[in-house]
UniProtKB/Swiss-Prot annotation:
Protein name listed in UniProt: Polyribonucleotide nucleotidyltransferase
CDD domains registered for this protein in UniProt: KH-I_PNPase (cd02393), RNase_PH_PNPase_1 (cd11363), RNase_PH_PNPase_2 (cd11364), S1_PNPase (cd04472)
Organism: Roseiflexus castenholzii (strain DSM 13941 / HLO8)
A molecular function (GO) term: magnesium ion binding
Superkingdom in the source lineage: Bacteria
One GO term describing the cellular component: cytosol
Cofactor: Mg(2+)
Signal peptide residue numbers: none
Annotated positions binding Mg(2+): 493, 499
Length: 746
């Protein structure tokens, strides 16, 4: 075995040391790099197949992000004690890693490439997501796999009005921005962000500042390449038969332009496909059988290249899009709400031939989604799921679990609404939204943002402002010309150079995602894209506000009602009872769902108003602070020769001494009361330390006070005591708090 040669390089990044190391692990991979930042440590490996795949017309890149519980010092909780399928967070990190790397492989490269990023250690301070991009890029950079990197990546926060690079994870709870930017030394490749209604100027400055640091990280990777990089394998792109393309172009004449310039996607696709079949039939007519398959593939590829160039030429030279729109024009918009009975809220958003129906369901706090990603235990009270069935594009496909794309689109729409959600203190409901894509011709994720905003307002959720989303595109020319397109459709997304999605309110941006298919874009292009996106977003909001501009005043009659109580946290144990016995008895008696927070907030959820009031009364009785002078209607639960025990509240009894049962002398307790009787009693004493309660029936009969009875010698040995807590009821919605949800990128 040859001696290992370990190489490492380091730099200071936001006050912490970033280290890249290779040579210690995974020597059989084409490239392997360990990234360490603080005590967060990831291993990235890159492996390429020896031969290209011949059965595909796209680049077969796979990126996997493996979360290992040992990285957080934990054992998996499953029966087999092994990690299971990737969590949603792991899938989103894998997509985040994939997106800036994919454009940097040579055009026509068809060797299968697999990148695996494995978490070795997580310190809960340094976010592993941007480090995953750095690690994967470094592994590719030092490998022999053709790659046009390296790529740097950082996280940018906006805390107390200032941009910060790679803030510690605990600090992100107070940040109005959670942005990851990735890029080469020359240009920005990818942006992903959630924000609290920030203006375009702040977002652009965050991208620019982040990219400046990305350049330094690229320099660090280049240092490692000099120390340990392997020579790149030679890759010769497949030759392009320009003479074939010229012949097809001449034969087509103006027919391709006529076929693709139709506003209806289905008509346009049918005409284009029919024309393609004609071209293939004409240019393969005299081909020998043994060469027919290869010739057909060549003609098909040539036709696609001609289509690609024609669509781009129309936009760059004439500002004309295939559906007749100009660069800034938005497709016709239709908005409807309240279409679906029984659901708690619904919104149908249609833009051109993209249509999304979003449905809202409200639930109790107990229905929050509990997450445990590498030991970071959190709960989500706002959940958005995105579905993309095959009929939405007129296709047939097997149904199954959500694909990575579905999870990514759902997460983008989810974080775009976080900034406008009411705080839990004001609106304690769990909110689940499901966006059903019914028809798709570009930007269904942004239609999901619009549909979510509509459904929330239709459900009566008091969001701070409506949110709309729009997708921008980009066409660039070899001569340096470029045009930004507003509201791109499917063909422009497929043949264009950028997918730039922006969501927000009239005030500012709440969600952002940018993917590039070229080797990067300039700040000037981004500035124009932001400006054009704002115009488009305001146009969409105007259309939405014409139908519903604010949340409904009342919740759906089918939604549960939640009443909030505030109790002394010291009373939580009494409310729960031994083994949950007490709270379970209240739930069984009323049918209400009861949830308790550590700070003493109690949520009572039920659709039955009478049951809700019954549960409130039981909770208040149980958690009420008993004080001297209080009057109770209690039930006699035990009779003794010296008096009777009366139940005042679940789990709390007091004693009426025989001398306090009646005005006159009582020889036999049962001459006055019997087991099961309900009697009115006054608290005349509470024994310090034990909390034993002394009661008097006599005081209520004579009109005396607790002090009068104590002065007469009743409750001897007892002193006024007890703890004061009370049970403060706030109703369905407590006053608005400034503690609103912070943006999440994932």
């Amino acid at each position: 075995m040859s001696e290992r040669r370990i190489h490492s390089v380091s730099m200071d990044l936001a006050g912490r040391t970033l280290t890249l190391e290779t040579g210690r692990f995974a020597e059989q991979a084409n490239g392997a790099v360990v990234v360490r930042y603080g005590d967060t440590m990831l291993l990235a490996t890159a492996v390429a197949s020896k031969e290209p795949r011949t059965d595909t017309d796209f680049f077969p890149l796979t990126v996997d992000y493996e979360e290992k519980m040992y990285a957080a010092g934990k054992i998996p909780g499953s029966f087999f004690k092994r990690e299971g399928k990737p969590t949603e967070g792991a899938i989103l990190t894998a997509r985040l890693t994939d997106r800036p790397l994919r454009p940097l492989f040579p055009e026509g490269y068809r060797n299968e490439v697999q990148i695996i990023v494995t978490t070795f250690s997580i310190d809960m301070v340094n976010d592993p997501a941007p480090l995953s991009i750095i690690a994967a890029s470094a592994a590719l950079a030092i490998s022999d796999i053709p790659f046009l990197g390296p790529v740097g990546a950082v996280q940018v926060g906006y805390i107390d009005g200032a941009l910060q690079i790679n803030p510690p994870m605990p600090n992100m709870a107070n940040s109005d921005l959670d942005l990851v930017v990735a890029g080469t030394k020359e240009a920005v490749l990818m942006v992903e962000a959630g924000a609290n209604e920030l203006p375009e100027e702040v977002m652009l400055e965050a991208v620019i500042q982040g990219h400046q640091v990305c350049k330094q990280i690229c320099d660090l990777q280049n240092e490692l390449v000099k120390l340990a990089g392997r020579p790149k394998k030679e890759f010769v792109p497949p030759p392009v038969d320009t003479s074939l393309e010229e012949a097809i172009q001449q034969w087509l004449g103006n027919r391709l332009y006529e076929a693709i310039t139709d506003a209806n996607k289905m008509v346009r696709d049918a005409q284009t496909e029919a024309l393609k079949r004609e071209v293939i039939a004409h240019f393969t007519a005299d081909e020998p059988e043994e060469e027919l398959e290869a010739r057909t593939a060549a003609v098909s590829a040539a036709f696609e290249n001609i289509l690609y160039e024609e669509v781009r030429r129309m936009i760059l030279e004439r500002g004309e899009r295939v559906d007749g729109r100009g660069p800034k024009d938005i497709r016709p918009i239709s908005v409807e709400v309240g279409l679906i009975p029984r659901v708690h809220g619904s919104g149908l958003f249609t833009r051109g031939q993209t249509q999304v129906l979003t449905l809202a369901t409200l639930g109790s706090p107990a229905e929050e989604q509990r997450l445990d990603d590498l030991g970071i235990e959190t709960a989500k009270r706002y959940i958005h799921h995105y579905n993309f069935p095959p009929f939405s594009t007129g296709e047939i496909r097997r149904l199954g679990s959500p694909r990575r794309r579905d999870i990514g689109h759902g997460a983008l729409a989810e974080r775009s609404l976080l900034a406008v959600l009411p705080p839990k203190e004001e609106f304690p409901y769990t909110m689940r939204l499901v966006s059903e894509t019914l028809s798709s011709n570009g930007s269904s994720s942004m239609a999901s943002v619009c549909g979510s905003s509509l459904a929330l307002m239709d459900a009566g959720v008091p969001i701070r402002a409506p949110v709309a989303g729009i997708a921008m595109g980009l066409i660039t020319g070899k001569d340096g010309r470029w045009r930004v397109l507003t509201d791109i459709q499917g063909i422009e997304d497929h043949l264009g150079d950028m997918d730039f999605k922006v969501a927000g309110t009239a005030k500012g941006i709440t969600g952002l995602q940018m993917d590039i298919k070229t080797t990067g874009i300039t700040y000037e292009i981004m500035r124009e894209a932001f400006a054009q996106a704002r115009e488009g977003r305001l146009h969409v909001l105007e259309k939405m506000n014409a139908v519903i501009s604010e949340p409904r005043k009342e919740l759906s009659p089918y939604a549960p009602r939640i009443i909030t109580l505030q109790i002394n946290p010291e009373k939580i144990g009494a409310l729960i009872g031994p083994g949950g016995k007490t709270i379970r008895s209240i739930t069984e008696a009323t049918g209400a769902q009861i949830d308790i927070e550590e700070d003493g907030r109690v949520y009572i959820s039920t659709a039955d108003a009478a049951a809700a009031q019954q549960a409130v009364a039981m909770v208040e009785a149980l958690t009420r602070e008993i004080k001297v002078g209080d009057i109770f209607l209690g039930k006699v639960v035990r009779i003794m020769p010296f008096g009777a025990f009366v139940n005042l509240a679940p789990g709390k009894d007091g004693m009426v001494h025989v001398s306090e049962l009646d005005v006159g002398r009582v020889e036999n307790v049962e001459d006055v009361i019997k087991m099961g009787d309900e009697i009115n009693v006054m608290v005349i004493g509470i024994e310090p330390g034990t909390g034993k309660v002394s009661l008097s029936r006599r005081a209520l009969l004579t009109g005396e006070t607790a002090e009068d009875r104590r002065a007469a010698g009743a409750g001897r040995g007892l002193r006024d005591g007890g703890r004061s807590s009370g049970s403060e009821r706030s109703g369905d919605r407590s006053p608005r708090s400034d503690d609103r949800p912070r943006p999440r990128r994932r």
